[in-house]
């Protein structure tokens, strides 16, 4: 089977490519970082529309997709237009689109505007957030898979630490509701560190949180930092309408304790108080963190249980998830399928 993987050559995209390449050696890579290097392109992509770049986008695919493939696999690529996708369909039996973001909300402004136009021409859309189900009927998506965010063996297994010297951490980008959340935790007396982008944009709470905020991390650094802390706080993106995130799987995969906002779906994946800790408010999060830090055996037991659930019982390693995706039979299957765990 011949596969063309299209996506940026960094972060989770690169690890997704390596997972597919491991399953299917005859896999080529088309790097879309070409677009990300152009600041003017990025500005128009986020703040207006890409119509003035349509010729450039189409030329990129015309010059780089010349061979025939069994599957052309897009990895969360917003830089695609209808004209290009119609030309690409001539080169493949199937077009798969792995959608890591939420292209149906306004959080990323105009970045995903073109995606809605190409939906009818994609053979299979893969969502790794269960909450995307609500958009499937609305946008008339005929063929889709819903799975769970993967972890990467080569990243997360290499960073499992038995001894964790630091206490509480949050790793993530700033959003307005997050500044208030951590201000409440600090006001109550909880000690924590924050790693991530854009926290200095919080005009109201940054001055109170400045000493807690560390640098932004790349993907491999993220796994190392997760492994150093006893408790990793997980917050869902309100603008992205999430009910689970990649971090919810990565934290237990790295052997640390997940303390996350409570959702019905998360409780199905990781049992509350046995494999993860959940909260519905800053006050509940504070109380649970204080209790756990006084009872480190509980932290250890829950961390171990969560790690076993993600790694052994559910087997959420990327290679296993992509194997299910590549083996998905578009002809014999029903119009929709959810990979259940």
Kindly label every feature range from the protein language model:
Residues 74-76, 88-95:
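Short, conserved structural micro-motifs that define repeat-unit consensus positions
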Residues 1-61, 69, 75-84, 106, ...:
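Nucleotide-sugar donor-binding catalytic core of glycosyltransferases
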Residues 315-341:
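C-terminal alpha-helical cap of glycosyltransferases
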């Amino acid at each position: 089977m011949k596969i063309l993987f299209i996506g940026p050559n960094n972060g989770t995209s690169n690890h997704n490519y390596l997972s597919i390449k491991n399953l299917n050696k005859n896999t080529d890579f088309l790097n879309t970082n070409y677009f990300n290097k152009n600041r003017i392109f990025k500005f128009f992509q986020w703040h207006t529309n890409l119509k003035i770049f349509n010729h450039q986008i189409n030329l990129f695919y015309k010059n780089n997709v010349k061979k025939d493939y069994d599957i052309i696999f897009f990895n969360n690529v917003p830089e695609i237009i209808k004209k290009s996708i119609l030309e690409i369909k001539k080169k493949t039996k199937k077009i798969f689109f792995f959608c890591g973001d939420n292209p149906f909300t306004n959080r990323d402004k105009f970045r995903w505007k073109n995606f809605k136009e190409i939906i009818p021409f994609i053979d299979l859309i893969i969502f790794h957030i269960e909450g995307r189900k609500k958009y499937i009927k609305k946008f008339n998506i005929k063929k889709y898979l819903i799975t769970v965010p993967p972890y990467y063996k080569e990243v997360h297994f290499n960073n499992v630490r038995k001894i964790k010297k630091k206490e509480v951490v949050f790793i993530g980008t700033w959003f307005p509701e997050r500044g208030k959340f951590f201000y409440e935790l600090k006001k109550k007396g909880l000690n924590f560190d924050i790693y991530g982008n854009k926290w200095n944009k919080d005009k109201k709470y940054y001055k109170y949180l400045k000493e807690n905020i560390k640098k932004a991390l790349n993907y491999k650094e993220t796994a190392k930092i997760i492994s150093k802390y006893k408790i990793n706080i997980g917050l869902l993106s309100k603008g992205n309408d999430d009910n689970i995130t990649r971090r919810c799987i990565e934290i237990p995969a790295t052997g640390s304790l997940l303390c996350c906002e409570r959702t019905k779906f998360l409780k199905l994946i990781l049992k509350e108080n046995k494999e993860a800790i959940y909260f519905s408010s800053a006050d509940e999060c504070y109380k649970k963190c204080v209790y756990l830090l006084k009872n480190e055996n509980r932290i250890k037991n829950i961390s171990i249980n969560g790690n076993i659930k993600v790694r052994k019982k559910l087997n959420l390693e990327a290679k296993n998830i992509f194997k299910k995706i590549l083996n998905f039979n578009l002809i014999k299957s029903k119009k929709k399928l959810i990979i259940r765990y």
